[in-house]
């Protein structure tokens, strides 16, 4: 199979469909045939009125927007999963690999507000809609006198709820607003030093099956019918990997690897009040990282520069080490690994 049809799995939200269609258009421009399959995840169902959240799952939990898509990928029903990179755990399941990280959109956070031009103009006691522990902690470090309200749903739903007066302001990722053309109410794009983005924010992750057969569980009969024989599936996956790899952006891949290495070394999952952002100028990589106590009262902030050529994981580990030396684990109430 030299040029197989690439089946893309995606969530059904407006933003997820935009992202999947964007990737599909790039693949088609390279001469590939593409199909989309919409997959409903437990994270999507948790936003339905009356849905009972399964025990052990949190609306902010790691993996709630990816499990069903990964299940379809492992079973051979799809060939490519398009995720927001920040939704993926730092430890990738061995059954899968990240084939490509396309060029990144704006990684910053956006401040949405109608009557005030920025965070510092809000009156004391104003309400801000965000459920992200990172955004809440970093906002409290800047404005300890504001309050937070819970607001869930996709971008359009949150913008509608905000416009109805359910909060004075709203914080969303710039990337999503830019992709959907919903920037009319963005009055401030926070600087990297004000609200350091979540590791990988603004980047897409193109996830495929691993080519290492020993990483796969023995397939069920129905899965063999879907994916063909093992040899045929391996040949097919190899061709698909090569097609998708053409969409990779080396600078975005490096930056996000360094950012995610910080989170991985600190431990504790993607819902920590931790931000990391890497960019490159000339021959130097710059990695910004920030950890904030949940109440916003204590901040550990690092900017580390290293020459181009330094492995991304080494850069991330070094910055994590510096954060830990500044008390990051205590701020986050994380037990050191050697004590576990």
Predicted regions and their residues:
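Small-molecule-sensing regulatory modules
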Residues: 2-49, 55-58, 141-214, 223-229, ...
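Short, well-ordered beta-strand segments
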Residues: 7-9, 37, 81, 99, ...
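Short, structured active-site "lid" loops
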Residues: 49-80
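Paired acidic/hydrophobic, glycine-rich loop segments that form the ligand-binding mouth/hinge
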Residues: 70, 79-83, 168-173
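Ordered, amphipathic secondary-structure segments that act as subunit-interaction surfaces
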Residues: 75-87, 209-211, 240
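A conserved helix-loop-strand patch within extracytoplasmic ligand-binding domains
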Residues: 85-88, 92-145, 209
